[in-house]
Amino acid sequence: MKKANRSAGSVPKVSGISKPQTVEKSKSENSSSAPTGGKPVKPGAAAALSKTKSNDDLLAGMAGGVNVTNGVKAKKSNCSSAAPSAPAPAMTISESKSKSSTGTSSSAKRSTSAGNKESSSTRERLRERTRLNQSKKLPSVSQGANDVALAKRSRSRTATEGDIRMSKSKSDNQISDKAALEAKVKDLLTLAKTKDVEILHLRNELRDMRAQLGISEDHCEGEDRSEEKETIIAHQPTDVESTLLQLQEQNTAIREELNQLKNENRMLKDRLNALGFSLEQRLDNSEKLFGYQSLSPEITPGNQSDGGGTLTSSVEGSAPGSVEDLLSQDENTLMAHQHSNSMDNLDSECSEVYQPLTSSDDALDAPSSSESEGVPSIERSRKGSSGNASEVSVACLTERIHQMEENQHSTSEELQATLQELADLQQITQELNSENERLGEEKVILMESLCQQSDKLEHFGRQIEYFRSLLDEHHISYVIDEDVKSGRYMELEQRYMDLAENARFEREQLLGVQQHLSNTLKMAEQDNKEAQEMIGALKERSHHMERIIESEQKGKAALAATLEEYKATVASDQIEMNRLKAQLEKEKQKVAELYSIHNSGDKSDIQDLLESVRLDKEKAETLASSLQEDLAHTRNDANRLQDTIAKVEDEYRAFQEEAKKQIEDLNMTLEKLRSELEEKETERSDMKETIFELEDEVEQHRAVKLHDNLIISDLENTVKKLQDQKHDLERENKTLHRRLREESAEWRQFQADLQTAVVIANDIKSEAQEEIGDLKRRLHEAQEKNEKLTKELEEIKSRKQEEERGRVYNYMNAVERDLAALRQGMGLSRRSSTSSEPTPTVKTLIKSFDSASQVPNAAAAAIPRTPLSPSPMKTPPAAAVSPMQRHSISGPVSTSKPLTALSDKRSNYGEIPGQEHLLRTSSTSRPASLPRVPAMESAKTISVSRRSSEEMKRDISASEGASPASLMAMGTTSPQLSLSSSPTASVTPSTRSRIREERKDPLSALAREYGGSKRNALLKWCQKKTEGYQNIDITNFSSSWNDGLAFCALLHTYLPAHIPYQELNSQEKKRNFTLAFQAAESVGIKSTLDINEMARTERPDWQNVMLYVTAIYKYFET
């Protein structure tokens, strides 16, 4: 506000500046109308000419005349008082003024020529007319002054009424503000029309007065005239010198104030650019700004070329706050009165207000009339500084727009990744729902089958009671068998009751768990809907930011066009200034010629010369008044600039606070989303753990049901035996001795068969041990041979390293391809083996249980494969080590192939040592830098395999009393036992679910490690892996990967021998992509990206890039 007060305080100086500025400006304007040839000058003016001190004083003395001076003063007062009453319709008045001024100058020239012709013929008649005109002149001037005073009163009255209306309208609401603004605009328009009529009337009177005064002054030859001239010539030079000094001081003050305003405007603009905001962002409607800027080039030259003073604002006639009110009202006025005739005036006013907003440096650097005459070097320096500042501001704006585009792309990429992950979570939730429904159906089936079995058990119990009653009726003695088996029956009944009670309790627990899971799923679906709504709001926010960026780009183009137009305007002003300077020089030369003619004594035609000089002086004074009005207009513009800058600062503070609030709201929303995602992750993990617990409970129920089926089958056998006993008890005594003899013979035969089976087993064991020893010996020989070959290879490499480098690289690539093919073959075989095994369902298990009840021996022998079978061990990545290490490793890996084949052939006895040996070779050949399988896990598998082999030996040695069929069955079940004794069999359900999830989605573990979404976790992993590499800045999955250096740096951390990173350059995109993709393909990672498309586009598809980086992470880190 201090700046505004200071600039507003400088406004009253306009009235003091007007007269000297008029004199100085008239020098350059009247040079064209001065006569080149002259008549003899009269000797009566010699005394006046001798008193002149300079050419400027000579002009003032030769153009003397009280009446002319008074007329000019009246004209200036009329113009200066008419201007502030109608600032809005400035353009229309200025155009009419320029036209009328040109008409006045032409009519004055014609009247001057006619007066010169008449003066030669009728001098006597004109003397009397001049006396009459002198007497009439004073009333006409007083009448003009009265008109001016009336106009001032009417303007002050209308201005005060407008201020009262404005003060009232500010306290009302927006509707009343709009109505008041419309009423004020109408008043201003009507006032402008009335002022136009008054100005035209005054111009006509002024034209008549000029014509009359010109004729009368041509032939003024009296003593009064000479005395007046002498007094004016005596007093005028001192007045001119004082006014010139005052004008120079005021010009320097104005120049310093403009420099200060320019510096402050630049500082504010630099601060705004540093903060990242442009001045046109605070406009409510950007299209208004573009319309104002398009109109501004037409208005600025018109204001500079105005001949009248309609835009000058004086202190006496202007009401306080009128400029501020217009600045606050111009937008609503534009919206309400687009159909009025004076729309151009309001547009010009708006453009004058908003031009400093768009290019304030250019507006401040535009030279005023006094500066253009006095200091051209300062003008040129200002022009250069304004051009540099505008270029710097445009460059800062371009850089800011580019940065906002990058942030926008990164935000949109992150939003798309979040949407994709939410869709995946929704799909997983649906799968869990379907799995839960399936488990519920299976549970219902299990409960139904359990009820059926309990009904069967009760039915069989009733049958047993019936059979016992029958035995009691026939008095058959079964007391011995009942005594023997009664304890077992009681125990079985007690166990059955306990199992039934436990089944009921577990059923109630399962129902509660199912209800809890259903409620949790409902809550998760509701949270998912809320998250989708939040994502939609974020999408709308991103679209809004895109529209803002487009509007900023349009504003940038409009700024550039306005800058060019301003440059053209300044160039035209410079040309006009040079022309005026040339005219001033010519005028000085003519004045010198007149002075020489006057001194020569030829004074015959001095009155004609004085008349022409007086006309030139009038023109110069009109020009000076116009320049004075331009200066006042410039001050008004400076005041408007100060007010506009203050308003922009207030709006910027408000915008900054609003932006901070929005950022805090967005941060809070982001934290809420993160917390909700974490809660969903925990709920999902809890649901998975609950599902795995339910699977364990289902397996327990299956085992219990199998046991119950066995009990039921025993009871059925018991019933059959009781029925047989009913028919065979009478013949039991007769056949007892014969059965004893047959059983003794069978026992002896069984012992002989058992001995032969033991001999065969010992032979097979000795053969297997001999084969194992042979294989160990061959392995030892192969290792020694491999060591010799490696030593020879090292010697050859030390001697011929430079010659054999190409062959070693070719051999390395061949070995890597073989290993990749071997790895792919193992993966295909693994997948085929896993896919070929059908998963057991509840219905198939129930059918198997029902069939087992009919065939108990077969059910006891068949053991189903558990779902907790271990995954096959991965081979170490051959490409993660150097080529020589891969060459040394490939030997033992290739020699381990016959071991696996032999272990497959002899799965009964040779599998355990073969697997143990394979684990040892793989653990020794794997590099220490990238361990795929932990050492503790391999030790566990080795210890488990040893225990299983020892237990199998003890079972074989202890099974001397078993049959060969049971021995073979035990041999076939031994691999299943060894598989079930793997380390994964003892894993908890939560870790087992985590392992399955990581195999299905490798980024889930990464998201748990780094937190947040999968996309952000993978981005953080890439940043961590490429930390320390030069020219790498990974912020997204599109533009950060467009030169190929990020791929090369990421693969260089694993494959340093394939990528010479120090030799790479960001300009050679195709070479970088080729090296990275070839290195990835050499280890088996298929390239899903096109090299040409990646090298051509600046922003590749982020989803394809993310998939490829995910493949790299999956290969090397999982």
UniProtKB/Swiss-Prot annotation:
Keywords: Cell cycle, Cell division, Cell junction, Coiled coil, Cytoplasm, Cytoskeleton, Gap junction, Phosphoprotein. The modification Phosphoserine is found at residues 385-386, 390, 869, 882, 888. It is found in: Cytoplasm, Cytoskeleton; Cytoplasm, Cytoskeleton, Spindle; Cell junction, Gap junction. GO terms for cellular component: actin cytoskeleton; cell-cell junction; cytoplasm; filamentous actin; gap junction; microtubule cytoskeleton; microtubule organizing center; spindle. Residues 1-50, 75-175, 294-324, 359-391, 916-999 are annotated as: Disordered. GO terms for molecular function: beta-catenin binding. Its main location: cytoplasm. One of its GO terms (biological process) is positive regulation of phosphatidylinositol 3-kinase/protein kinase B signal transduction. Residues 120-131, 158-171, 947-957 have a biased composition (Basic and acidic residues). Residues 168-281, 395-450, 488-808 form a coiled coil. Residues 1012-1117 form the Calponin-homology (CH) domain. May interact with both microtubules and actin cytoskeleton. Involved in cytokinesis and spindle organization. May play a role in actin cytoskeleton organization and microtubule stabilization and hence required for proper cell adhesion and migration. Belongs to the cytospin-A family. This is Cytospin-A. It comes from Rattus norvegicus. The gene is Specc1l.
